[in-house]
């Protein structure tokens, strides 16, 4: 069999998960079912409190054994009264923590100092929110990047730039334009040949 060695850090991580899983299985809704809802430190504090309660319960059991039937009824009433007092104390403590958090809330203190009713205070806050939204929209509109229209390539007005016609070549490219080709065609039609290059210059045809 393979032995699994667990160090202290691994055990500290597993204990909260085990307790959290047990509480979910029992269907308790007093605790959130998240891994962060319980920690090892809180479990140690609970263990300390349990260690203090256990001797009290043991002492109570020893005393109950020597009690009579009439004393048992008094003990039950005393325990019931103590439970009621503890429940009230827990409720007061939770309310005290809630009041403490509210007293540290600046917005709540502003509401109390204003002397307004709840509806008036909420409507005033809504107006402040609407005013802030308007300012944000105005700021966004003012600082939005402007989109320029694309530049047109068609000459407008007194544009003196030369526009090349269809079928016409640029003179710098060394090609003939339409007028040059027309002149060469007319000369060929009249029986004349354009002057040649090399040995063909100045020759005449001789008939025998």
Swiss-Prot record:
Localisation per UniProt entry = Nucleus; Cytoplasm, Cytoskeleton, Spindle pole; Chromosome, Centromere, Kinetochore
Q: Which InterPro entries match?
A: DASH_Duo1
Q: Which keywords label this protein?
A: Cell cycle, Cell division, Centromere, Chromosome, Chromosome partition, Coiled coil, Cytoplasm, Cytoskeleton, Kinetochore, Microtubule, Mitosis, Nucleus
- Compositional bias ranges of the Low complexity kind: 181-201
Region (Disordered), start-end ranges = 140-208
**Any Pfam family matching the protein:** DASH_Duo1
Query: Mostly located where?
Result: nucleus
Statement: the UniProt record of this protein carries the keyword Nucleus: yes
Q: Which residues form a coiled coil?
A: 115-144
Q: Which GO terms describe its biological process?
A: attachment of spindle microtubules to kinetochore; cell division; mitotic sister chromatid biorientation; protein transport along microtubule to mitotic spindle pole body
- What does the entry list under GO cellular component? cytoplasm; DASH complex; microtubule; mitotic spindle; spindle pole
- This protein's record includes keyword Cell division: yes
Stated family: Belongs to the DASH complex DUO1 family.
- What is the recorded function of this protein according to its Swiss-Prot or TrEMBL entry? Component of the DASH complex that connects microtubules with kinetochores and couples microtubule depolymerisation to chromosome movement; it is involved in retrieving kinetochores to the spindle poles before their re-orientation on the spindle in early mitosis and allows microtubule depolymerization to pull chromosomes apart and resist detachment during anaphase.
* Subunit structure and binding partners: Component of the DASH complex consisting of ASK1, DAD1, DAD2, DAD3, DAD4, DAM1, DUO1, HSK3, SPC19 and SPC34, with a stoichiometry of one copy of each subunit per complex. Multiple DASH complexes oligomerize to form a ring that encircles spindle microtubules and organizes the rod-like NDC80 complexes of the outer kinetochore. DASH complex oligomerization strengthens microtubule attachments. On cytoplasmic microtubules, DASH complexes appear to form patches instead of rings. Within the complex, DAM1 and DUO1 may form the microtubule connections.
* Name assigned to this protein: DASH complex subunit DUO1
Q: Which organism is it from?
A: Kluyveromyces lactis (strain ATCC 8585 / CBS 2359 / DSM 70799 / NBRC 1267 / NRRL Y-1140 / WM37)
Q: Which gene encodes it?
A: DUO1
